[in-house]
């Protein structure tokens, strides 16, 4: 599936690619990087790097999907930088559907979060990686449950900074802002209307439409 997405984006003549999904980064990044010449980055390594800079007691928590936790990639990257660090992973599979249902402030979501995070609170972590792109939308709730003593790390933010550096290093960074009434293009493989509604609820730009593509054609 990640390869099909890559093939489609190549038809759009992209100059760089961010695999902005922790699970896809964990499972497909290394393979995809070997297949194209454009710069490609994932979100796992940037998140791991900033967590290593942030922790004071070398106890780092990671919440993510089951696939990301099972891959062990966050722990691998963290141990490359801080071999002495203890990494505690916790899969939180219900967070994604709760966010997509628009239940971020629902009492049910707080109850689910409290049960997921109880184990991490008992481990005395001081840094917690939000290892899924949906989870920063629950940042306020997660922070409230974990307490001020735990620093939350959003890999997406760190990835954006790394992308800027990467574009500058390759001499392909643009110094102009996107022009036109609709300078952004959005493509989805399914559920275009749901994507538009969800995106308009969280993004600072208005998304009039998202184009649905047949990913199987790639």
Tell me the role of every PLM-derived stretch.
Residues 1-218:
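Non-catalytic structural scaffold of enzyme domains
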């Amino acid at each position: 599936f990640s390869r099909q997405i890559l093939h489609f984006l190549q038809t759009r003549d992209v100059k760089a690619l961010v695999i902005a999904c922790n699970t896809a980064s964990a499972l497909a990044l290394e393979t995809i990087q070997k297949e194209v010449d454009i710069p490609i980055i994932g979100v796992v390594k940037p998140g791991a790097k900033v967590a290593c800079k942030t922790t004071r007691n070398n106890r780092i928590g990671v919440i993510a999907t089951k696939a990301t936790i099972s891959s062990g990639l966050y722990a691998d990257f963290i141990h490359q930088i801080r071999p002495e660090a203890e990494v505690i992973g916790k899969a939180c599979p219900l967070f994604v559907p709760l966010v997509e249902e628009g239940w971020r402030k629902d009492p049910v979501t707080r109850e689910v979060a409290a049960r997921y995070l109880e184990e991490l609170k008992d481990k005395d972590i001081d840094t917690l990686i939000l290892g899924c792109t949906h989870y920063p939308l629950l940042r306020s709730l997660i922070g409230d449950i974990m307490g001020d003593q735990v620093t939350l790390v959003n890999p997406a933010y760190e990835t954006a900074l790394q992308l800027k550096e990467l574009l500058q290093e390759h001499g392909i960074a643009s110094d102009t802002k996107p022009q036109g009434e609709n300078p952004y293009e959005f493509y989805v493989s399914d559920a275009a209307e749901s994507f538009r509604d969800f995106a308009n609820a969280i993004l600072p730009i208005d998304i009039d439409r998202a184009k649905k593509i047949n990913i199987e054609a790639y």
